[in-house]
Amino acid sequence: MTVIIAGERSGAGKTTITLAMLAYLARQKLRVQSFKVGPDYIDPMFHSQITGRPCRNLDPFLTSEAYVQRCFHYHSQGTPYSLIEGVMGLFDGVPYQGLTDYSSTAHIARLLNLPIVFVMDCQRLSGSVAAIVQGYRHWQPGVNLVGVILNRVGGDRHLELLKIALEPLRIPILGVFFRQQDLTLPDRHLGLVPCGELPQIQQYFDQLAHVAAQQLDWPKLLPLLETPRNLPSPMSLFDVPQKSPQARLAIAQDQAFNFYYADNLDLLTHCGFELIPFSPLEDTELPPAIDGVYLGGGFPELFAEQLSQNQALKDQLKTLIHQGLPTYGECGGLMYLSQSLTNFEGQIFPMLEMLPTAVTMGGKLSLGYRQAQVVNSHSWLWQTESLRGHEFHRSQMTKLPNQALYRQRGLLAIDQNTTDGWCVGSVQASYLHLHWGSQISTVEKFRAACLAFQKKLSYLGKHPPFKSVPLRNTGGDAHGRE
């Protein structure tokens, strides 16, 4: 059937309980495909660490409703179990296309016709829990709550009061997590600390699996997680033909740069890129014969000193950029491309110095969906092309571009038009995070720029000819689909 794990608000315990369920299934050697509603990067890292499979984001604003359906159907194929973690509170979305809850957990439930297991934070509640559950249960037609999991229960007496309150609703209680069980993950300025920075993460997953085995009603819950057998079976996730490898793309992947959507990586491969990971933290040289660089988001502010001191890699990358190497940076990538990065402690570290601005940490959180229009005629993208993305950062540029890459605004009437992004030579960088699932032309234009650079250096005798490798199926398979 597949269920969505939802909650009444952020912090109710959706992530902890989702991870506990995934950890239990993994310890039972049961294959499961996980999904995450919304644009988040960090929660999917934890999912993937447990399951050994890339978690897939389901976000109709960043992509489209049709893409969300195709993504779920495509990636669920071949796995006996599927599980979706929701976002924020059940009905928390944005006003868009006539809906007030667009991209919410409830929106995804309606799109995919899936039931919901509702996580209820029971701290400082007893009888009132029934009113909350009943309200969420009947607030919106088409949203089907098939059970609740009670979280942060104080003890046996508290649990008895909760059961008495919920009994008239006749809604199954599928699990109970007690407050005494310390299952909290550390967090910081942009959410959870990524699992790659937590040395004891496997012990934590073992603890979650143990608690899940004891506290969840698996005879009732496991059938709800079975992947539906009557789903459509799309042959490909993407609606463009697959291309054989044509260009080498160096992609920054380490503790400083790790915000990448799995579908984006699959799409790059599908569109003819050979992806070559490198570490701006550890590597002293770039991969050989590259045709482009992708610097994703992450936490460069936490590794600014180490990034700054890796002068050999910085010098090589700067030389190639001056030669015209197409370079794309998102958020953390923009920060790395700037003149300098001032961390939260006020320390200043020189960066790549490819953009005429510096970046300073601090200030208010910039957060939310953005509708953007390309306004820079020197971009690889078509001028006036419209894109949808999101911002999530706590840093500011010291100088804004005179001719920005994007003109953009949020989705509320109170939101103002703003500009964002740089287009300097062969560099494009902005704070905007993009999911390319429904914006494939962006990848195709980036590929065209990389192929033009490849041709230029080959003509000058500075670039060996590209050696094609056998075509492999993508749209998921290249990055973990079995």
Curated annotation (Swiss-Prot):
One Pfam family of this chain: GATase_3
Any one of the GO BP annotations: cobalamin biosynthetic process
EC number: 6.3.5.11
Catalytic activity annotation: cob(II)yrinate + 2 L-glutamine + 2 ATP + 2 H2O = cob(II)yrinate a,c diamide + 2 L-glutamate + 2 ADP + 2 phosphate + 2 H(+)
GO molecular function: ATP binding; cobyrinic acid a,c-diamide synthase activity
Database matches in SUPFAM superfamilies: Class I glutamine amidotransferase-like (SSF52317), P-loop containing nucleoside triphosphate hydrolases (SSF52540)
Full protein name: Cobyrinate a,c-diamide synthase
Disulfide pairings: none
Coiled coil start-end: none
Needed co-factor(s): Mg(2+)
Function (record text): Catalyzes the ATP-dependent amidation of the two carboxylate groups at positions a and c of cobyrinate, using either L-glutamine or ammonia as the nitrogen source.
Other information: The a and c carboxylates of cobyrinate are activated for nucleophilic attack via formation of a phosphorylated intermediate by ATP. CbiA catalyzes first the amidation of the c-carboxylate, and then that of the a-carboxylate.
Annotated positions for site Increases nucleophilicity of active site Cys: 433
NCBIfam families on file: cobB, PRK01077.1
Source organism: Synechocystis sp. (strain ATCC 27184 / PCC 6803 / Kazusa)
UniProt-annotated catalytic positions: 331 (nucleophile)
Pathway: Cofactor biosynthesis; adenosylcobalamin biosynthesis; cob(II)yrinate a,c-diamide from sirohydrochlorin (anaerobic route): step 10/10
Domain GATase cobBQ-type: 248-441
Written domain comment of the UniProt record: Comprises of two domains. The C-terminal domain contains the binding site for glutamine and catalyzes the hydrolysis of this substrate to glutamate and ammonia. The N-terminal domain is anticipated to bind ATP and cobyrinate and catalyzes the ultimate synthesis of the diamide product. The ammonia produced via the glutaminase domain is probably translocated to the adjacent domain via a molecular tunnel, where it reacts with an activated intermediate.
CDD domains membership: CobB_N (cd05388), GATase1_CobB (cd03130)
Top enzyme category: ligase
